[in-house]
């Protein structure tokens, strides 16, 4: 890429063996800039919150975590699985310094949609340094432990975790807000020292 930039050649078209043909060099330069950033694995002050919910309890928790993280001045991408599919989540993960994952416990396990996304993300081998887990449950509550295992297998340092039996009360909501702030502060410190 450096050779392209310094060659002095006037490039009018880029036609790779695989992928789109570029005739607009302004658009190609934007894509090239993104590719350089992504291949260098530079991370931003960004947190991706991935969650799914059955009866809205986990979503309530996610919203309070989001509020806490945003109050600390970092970028937050909310990725509820009822609105985003896994490739869209993977795109947001490229430059994220933290991932916070939440799901309800279902049949002594995590919600199936989260297992799918986490398996997919694990295979992409992102270098996300920090994470946290949260979730709601009614009986057994194994979800957080399993979410934690997924993230740890990806090399993510778990900053904190919260679980709520049934609908989160005010105490749990405050804990979620603080979790968001805590992860955001870890991210800011990481980027500062990067």
What do the predicted segments below correspond to?
Residues 81-87:
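Short acidic loop-to-helix transition motifs that present clustered carboxylates
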Residues 1-21, 64-77, 89-194:
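FMN-binding flavodoxin-like domain, especially the glycine-rich phosphate-binding loop
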Residues 1-75, 82:
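Accessory terminal helices/loops
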């Amino acid at each position: 890429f450096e050779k392209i930039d310094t060659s002095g050649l006037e490039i009018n078209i880029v036609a790779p063996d695989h992928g789109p043909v570029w005739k607009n060099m302004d658009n190609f330069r934007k894509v090239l800039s993104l590719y350089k950033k992504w291949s260098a694995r530079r991370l931003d002050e960004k947190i991706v919150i991935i969650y799914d919910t059955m009866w809205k309890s986990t979503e309530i928790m996610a919203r309070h975590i989001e509020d806490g993280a945003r109050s600390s001045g970092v970028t937050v991408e909310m990725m509820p699985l009822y609105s985003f599919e896994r490739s869209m989540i993977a795109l947001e993960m490229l430059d994220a310094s933290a991932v916070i994952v939440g799901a309800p416990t279902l049949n002594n396990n995590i919600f199936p949609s989260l297992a799918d996304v986490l398996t997919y993300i694990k295979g992409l081998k992102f270098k996300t340094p920090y994470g946290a887990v949260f979730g709601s449950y009614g009986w057994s509550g194994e979800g957080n432990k399993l979410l934690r295992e997924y993230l740890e297998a990806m090399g993510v340092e778990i900053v904190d975790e919260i679980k709520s039996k049934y609908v989160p009360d005010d105490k749990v909501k405050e804990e979620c807000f603080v979790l968001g702030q805590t992860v955001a502060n870890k991210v800011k410190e990481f980027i500062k020292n990067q």
